[in-house]
Amino acid sequence: MDINSIIIIFFSFLIGSIPSAYIIGKKLKSIDLTKKGSRNTGVSNLTQNTNLYASLPVIFFDLFIKGFLPIFLCSDSIFSLDINTKILCGMVSLIGHNWSFFLNFKGGRGIATLVGIILAIDYNLFVILSGIIAIGYLFSPIKDSALWWI
């Protein structure tokens, strides 16, 4: 593993650890998501405690900056790192999101971040999984975004 790999993996964890929903909740509504609703610091809890419009920048940030960007930086056009490093960057970004060291290792569920990771790794897989998730969500009696398969 070379120095570029180590730097991008560390960068991925730092980016993943930024608690975007928590920050928006504090700035817009002065709410602490770790003490409201489901107590996770993700988009769904932010939406439940504010509104969808407050969640849109968080969805964008989590999907594209936390999920897509670290893997894009590993691509052939930037650092030309192998697929294992790409997957590792995605994993540490997701770990950073789910257990942010900025919030004493509390975080969200990582759904938007994972979608960004899948989109960056394989667009075809993204399309297939999106269809499966949409069908599962439509037919599930539970409408929580993370629990449709239970």
Where do the protein language model's features map onto the residues?
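Helix-coil boundary and interhelical linker segments in multi-pass alpha-helical membrane proteins
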Residues: M1-I8, G67-L88, L119-F126
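Hydrophobic alpha-helical transmembrane segments
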Residues: I6-F11, L56-F60, K86-M91, V115, ...
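Cytosolic, membrane-interface loops and tails of multi-pass inner-membrane proteins
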Residues: Y22-S55, G107
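Multi-pass membrane catalytic core of lipid/isoprenoid biosynthesis enzymes
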Residues: Q48-S75, C89
